[in-house]
């Protein structure tokens, strides 16, 4: 199968991943319909939102996030820095959330040091950061499984893909082998041996680690 070159021991040089989250129960004042999230990295860029001024750089403080709403489009930098609306409108939004005036690392340290009975959770505690990290690495899994040529359905509670066929096989390019032969571009890829796709995916999800190192006896 025509698979782009993937590196077995590191992340892809660039990737684009599309996540589709099903509709959720509505919140008191906010509807929660199905939503799509598009992830770009490695220099790949999304389309510029309609109405964004010419010359305006989307990359703000190391990255950007674009939120398409029914009334406007919001753009912010990495970690939500410097948000603005494409229309130029500046809304008078009530401040109902605790503002983090220090780094998120120190906010986490503060929460660790506080008494458990009256602790104020950090702005990105494990209950939030864990599922977020799961989403990101699930996209990396999808890139490594692209040879299946299918949309993958994820079962979060059971940490597995539900629609990979039992007999599906997958292989990965380990050497590109591109060269010019007699003036013509030639592609001579080297592939891994085919492996069962379900087992391959499960090993990536729950890796089998080797035994740890043992330190020699220390002198007293």
Language-model segment annotations:
Residues 2-126, 130-169, 173-220:
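Glycine-rich, aromatic-lined ligand/substrate-binding cores of catalytic
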């Amino acid at each position: 199968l025509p698979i782009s070159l993937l590196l077995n021991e590191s992340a892809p040089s660039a990737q684009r991943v599309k996540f589709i989250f099903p509709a959720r129960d509505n919140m008191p004042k906010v509807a929660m319909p199905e939503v799509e999230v598009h992830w770009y990295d490695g220099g790949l860029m999304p389309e510029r939102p309609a109405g964004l001024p010419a010359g305006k750089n989307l990359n703000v403080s190391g990255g950007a996030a674009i939120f398409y709403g029914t009334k406007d489009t919001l753009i912010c930098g990495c970690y939500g820095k410097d948000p603005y609306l494409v229309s130029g409108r500046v809304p008078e939004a009530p401040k109902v959330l605790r503002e983090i005036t220090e780094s998120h690392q120190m906010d986490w340290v503060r929460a660790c040091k506080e008494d458990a009975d009256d602790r104020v959770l950090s702005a990105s505690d494990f209950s939030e950061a864990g599922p977020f990290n799961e989403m990101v690495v699930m996209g990396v899994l999808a890139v490594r499984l692209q040879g299946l040529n299918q949309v993958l359905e994820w079962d979060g509670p059971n940490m597995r893909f539900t629609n990979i066929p039992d007999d599906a096989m997958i292989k990965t390019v380990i050497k590109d082998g591109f060269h010019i032969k007699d003036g013509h571009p030639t592609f001579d890829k080297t592939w891994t041996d085919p492996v069962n796709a379900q087992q391959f995916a499960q090993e990536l999800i729950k890796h089998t680690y080797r035994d740890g190192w043992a330190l020699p006896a220390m002198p007293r």
